């Protein structure tokens, strides 16, 4: 994956995030763009989807702790500064467009820390910080749309909700010529992402050799 292949577009001031969002066909899909009042819904669907995720279980330990983390990320970063979609049958995504810099607020970080102290397992905050550092080390420098999370409720599984969440955005990225990046935290999902054009960039352990692995994946835009 070339790190600087798309730098000329940014130098010309092209707003890829707006281009992609304009091309997403929400009218013929079941998706709805989340607004600021939807942060808890986005987070709680995501928390339910990742409750048994190997990486999140290793880092945070409990479903309540995992949900607490996603509430901070949805409220402070992805709903106000990124792009989040909701599916009526119980699905949600959190995306970040290229060139957008966002971080949790100080209050959000305090709420996260408090949530981990109350609900998490010992060492959860440190493990979370270490994972964040490793994710940053692997994160590509080349501009891209970043898929932070995609997930469904337990009741929505097996109904094609995941594909319905992903395909409209990938189609829009193809139309705008924008690559996509994600980190797969569950080996069971590798085939799903591969079927949508993602290729593995590598793999890294969350902590030591016996810890779960993350699988960074990259998708080049497909020609029309």
Role assignments for model-derived ranges:
Residues 1-21:
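N-terminal amphipathic/basic-hydrophobic helices that include classical n-h-c signal peptides
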Residues 158-171:
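Conserved acetyl-CoA-binding loop-helix of GNAT-fold acetyltransferases
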Residues 30-44:
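A short beta-loop-alpha structural element at the N-terminal edge
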Residues 68-91, 140-146:
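A short helix-loop-beta-strand connector motif used in the catalytic cores of GNAT acetyltransferases and
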């Amino acid at each position: 994956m070339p790190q600087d292949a798309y730098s000329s577009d940014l130098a010309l001031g092209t707003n890829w995030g707006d281009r992609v969002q304009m091309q997403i066909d929400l009218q013929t899909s079941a998706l709805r763009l989340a607004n600021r009042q939807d942060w808890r819904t986005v987070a709680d669907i995501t928390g339910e989807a990742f409750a048994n995720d190997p990486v999140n279980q290793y880092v945070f330990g409990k479903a309540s702790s995992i949900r607490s983390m996603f509430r901070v990320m949805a409220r402070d970063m992805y709903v106000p500064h990124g792009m989040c979609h909701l599916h009526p049958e119980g699905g949600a995504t959190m995306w970040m467009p290229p060139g957008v810099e966002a971080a949790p607020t100080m209050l959000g970080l305090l709420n996260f820390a408090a949530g981990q102290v109350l609900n998490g397992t010992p060492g959860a905050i440190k493990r979370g910080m270490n994972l964040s550092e490793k994710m940053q080390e692997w994160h590509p420098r080349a501009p891209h749309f970043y898929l932070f999370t995609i997930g469904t409720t337990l009741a929505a599984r097996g109904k094609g909700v995941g594909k319905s969440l992903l395909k409209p955005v990938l189609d829009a990225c193809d139309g705008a010529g924008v690559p996509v990046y994600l980190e797969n935290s569950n080996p069971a999902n590798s085939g799903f992402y591969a079927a949508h054009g993602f290729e593995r960039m590598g793999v890294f352990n969350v902590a030591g050799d016996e810890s779960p692995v993350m699988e960074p994946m990259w998708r080049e835009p497909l020609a029309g």
